């Protein structure tokens, strides 16, 4: 497992792959308990079907959330997912299709260490303003301020030193980068700008 008790553990399951077009069913039994001795067991059936690289495997929704600067969801698109593509590759394609320029570090390919640093698009930050309550909390906590960015771009170190883009999938923050994550059919990936 990776992670910790505080943040939650993550496990990677590796099943032997069936031939292309075939499928295999696996049963996973999960037993978990807490410090008080309470326990629960869940059984999950996983159907593993192999498809060829590049084949269409479903749809996902990608959102861009700039609520922390008062803009809410600035874009939301349904995208096709291709077998073998990382979340980073899918996100970059969506951003390009929607007219964004993405500044990033690393590579979008699997295990490429991808980090989304900045999004740029004309008037992206038009009417942006950090909500007063959030700004008060940032100042109260002594977070180092850096100043507001220009009108067309939002990214790392804008407003505060801890600011940047994070992502969640279906409300869960994976403990790995976008180039280590693969999207599944029906997933909702949110790119969320944070200030701390």
Where are these regions (language model features)?
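Ubiquitin-like/PB1-type beta-grasp interaction modules and other compact soluble beta-rich domains
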Residues: 1-196
